[in-house]
Amino acid sequence: MPRKGNIPKREVLPDPMYGSKVVTKLINNLMVDGKKGKSQRIVYDAFAIVAEKTGEEALEVFNKAMDNIMPVLEVKARRVGGANYQVPIEVRPERRQTLGLRWLVKYTRARGEKGMVEKLAKEIMDAANNTGASVKKKEDTHKMAEANKAFAHYRW
């Protein structure tokens, strides 16, 4: 553990096409083996499909999707007297975004469509309509937190 205090976080630069830091984070999450150009092309092509199919601004649809994916509560294991309890805690804003992006990419990869562009576009549109696997993951996380509400007093 470092003794010199906190290490400053590196600032994420907004992406060149939409000027959004969240889109940059999506591109970075999607990137495999350092191939950022390929990842950018996938995201921008998917956004083009989203804009074409919904008739709305792609960034607005993406932001709506992110709002529907990001969790408010999660559970954290806490050991008390030899027993492990799943303690519900609120999710910090930065972690909410990180989890939302992580789930979006994970469930995009798990989809059955042909081609990553199509998968990502469909998952974003589904999430914007409050359906899809990534939204289900958020709902499951919230259900888990709700079910373990009794252990909320173990919060630290």
UniProtKB/Swiss-Prot annotation:
Coiled-coil residues: none
Keywords annotated in UniProt: Ribonucleoprotein, Ribosomal protein, RNA-binding, rRNA-binding, tRNA-binding
GO annotation, biological process: translation
InterPro entries named in the record: Ribosomal_uS7, Ribosomal_uS7_bac/org-type, Ribosomal_uS7_CS, Ribosomal_uS7_dom, Ribosomal_uS7_dom_sf
Molecular-function GO term, any one: rRNA binding
Recorded GO CC terms: small ribosomal subunit
SUPFAM superfamilies per UniProt: Ribosomal protein S7
Membership in a protein family: Belongs to the universal ribosomal protein uS7 family.
NCBIfam families: rpsG_bact
Subunit structure: Part of the 30S ribosomal subunit. Contacts proteins S9 and S11.
Function: One of the primary rRNA binding proteins, it binds directly to 16S rRNA where it nucleates assembly of the head domain of the 30S subunit. Is located at the subunit interface close to the decoding center, probably blocks exit of the E-site tRNA.
Name by which UniProt lists this protein: Small ribosomal subunit protein uS7
Organism annotation: Clostridioides difficile (strain 630)
Gene behind the chain: rpsG
